Structure formats: C-alpha cells, structure tokens
Amino acid sequence: MRKEVLDNELAKIEKISKEFGVKKVFLFGSCLESVETANDIDIAVEGIKAKDFFKYYGRISMATDNEVDLVDLDDIREHFQKRILTKGRIIYERAV
C-alpha cells in the first residue's frame, strides 16, 4: 500500500470516528512497520459504546478501499492493549 493511500484511508476513518464520538483511534501493526508491504490497516478504538461498535466497523468497511482490522481497546487482553498503547500511533483524539 502506498503512503498516500494509507493517509487517504486514515482521513476517512478519522471523519467516521468524529461522527461516532469515539475517544481515540490508534494505528498499529504492519502499517507502522512497512506501509509498502502492509495488506491491511490495523486500528484500535477507545471509548466507543458497545452497541455502536459493529455499526462503526461497518461504516469504516464501507468507506475504505482496503481491509481494516478493528479492535475495541477497552475489550482486549491487557498485554495486547499495552502493546498498542506503547507502539501504536494515535490517528484521532476527540477534543475535550
């Protein structure tokens, strides 16, 4: 995936994240290691209501041209959560 393509996809994800009022969105995984060889976009979301998670994921899937793997940061094992928080990159943060 080209960097320009990733940036475009992340802009779409940011817009949808604003609409859903999520707290933060992190990019992690292969896109951070090597954009050119990444097959998908790994993101973690923090502060989304459980009832809205699949609707949010559906909107992202419909809006993006690349496969997106989404995890709820509040609903994953602690060691995975810590890895995302330390190695991931914040791509969206709701204004306080």
Task: Describe each model-derived feature in a short phrase.
Residues 44-46:
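Short hydrophobic/aromatic beta-strand micro-patches
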